[in-house]
Amino acid sequence: MSDDLNLEELKRRLKEGDYLEISTGGGAYEVWAEPYATPPAVYFEGEQHPIAELDGIAQRIMDEMHRGEIRCRWVEDD
């Protein structure tokens, strides 16, 4: 997936409620945003962050993916 994912698409899909699964050497976790929650938040590495941090988190994901440190895939609804 890394070849067809860009920063803007990553931010857009997270804001739209899609879940991104990140696989590392030590396991996997999901990233998602809840822009309409109170307070609006993004969930990353098992922690809740203010939605204002979404751009920085998305950039970090892209950087780590391009360095080959993580693999990503969108979680599909069954």
Region annotations inferred by a language model:
Residues 23-66:
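Acidic, low-complexity, intrinsically disordered interaction modules
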Residues 75-78:
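Short acidic DE-rich linear segments
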Residues 13-20, 60, 64-71:
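Surface-exposed polar/charged interaction patches
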Residues 3-29:
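N-terminal acidic leader/helix
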